[in-house]
Amino acid sequence: MFAFLTSKKVGILPSRWGSSRFPGKPLAKILGKTLVQRSYENALSSQSLDCVVVATDDQRIFDHVVEFGGLCVMTSTSCANGTERVEEVVSRHFPQAEIVVNIQGDEPCLSPTVIDGLVSTLENNPAADMVTPVTETTDPEAILTDHKVKCVFDKNGKALYFSRSAIPHNFKHPTPIYLHIGVYAFRKAFLSEYVKIPPSSLSLAEDLEQLRVLETGRSIYVHVVQNATGPSVDYPEDITKVEQYLLCLSKASF
């Protein structure tokens, strides 16, 4: 636990059992390893984090993480979302933390370089309260589905809006469309403020909690990445997609 006391850059993976779309998802097997283990080991490969820990309120997940040698913290069952779970762990266990990265446990193909880029962007941009990655897409299915969040941002990388709709709407002039990747790097002080911001009209309408930040006038900056993530796991059928993606990566490395 000494690492908890001294860590300044912390990665936390909130993990819960009760997903409505895929109950027990963290312990689903992907080519012999569970989803939570793959996500954890990816985060450990980051060059910028001092410590990586799983945050859960489920004993089954806790026991599994400890079994494969990971660090895990039990949180209260009252956390309304993953961000609140992350903030609870940081406030209780990481007194020296300066930067906190909320790493989604359903992105087993996320490159650790994405985490490094978020931390670097936050360190080098005093105006940023938090940073999140985006990637350009031309995939019509991803653009049109409301399961994929799109983002528009200004020339300095400051997010203007996030939406489940296709934004911008290319009515007259073709413009790149960027998908949001659900990983966030916070300054610790702002994370404590963030969880106290009440839901806003836009965040409720889009079901995107980060919109409450924009509605209060605070800043989210983006870090543009390329080929840094593969398929995520939202439904049981996504497991096959992830396995095929990982097998292709393995073959390509030879």
Curated annotation (Swiss-Prot):
GO CC list? cytosol
Give the metabolic or biological pathway.
Answer: Nucleotide-sugar biosynthesis; CMP-3-deoxy-D-manno-octulosonate biosynthesis; CMP-3-deoxy-D-manno-octulosonate from 3-deoxy-D-manno-octulosonate and CTP: step 1/1; Bacterial outer membrane biogenesis; lipopolysaccharide biosynthesis
Q: Which GO terms describe its biological process?
A: CMP-keto-3-deoxy-D-manno-octulosonic acid biosynthetic process; lipopolysaccharide biosynthetic process
**Recorded catalytic activity of this chain's protein:** 3-deoxy-alpha-D-manno-oct-2-ulosonate + CTP = CMP-3-deoxy-beta-D-manno-octulosonate + diphosphate
SUPFAM superfamilies in UniProt? Nucleotide-diphospho-sugar transferases (SSF53448)
Give the matching Pfam families.
CTP_transf_3 (PF02348)
GO molecular function term, any single one: 3-deoxy-manno-octulosonate cytidylyltransferase activity
Asked if S-adenosyl-L-methionine is a keyword of the record, the answer is: no
What does the UniProt entry say about where the protein is found?
A: Cytoplasm
Family assignment from sequence similarity: Belongs to the KdsB family.
Q: Describe the function of this protein.
A: Activates KDO (a required 8-carbon sugar) for incorporation into bacterial lipopolysaccharide in Gram-negative bacteria.
Q: What is this protein called?
A: 3-deoxy-manno-octulosonate cytidylyltransferase
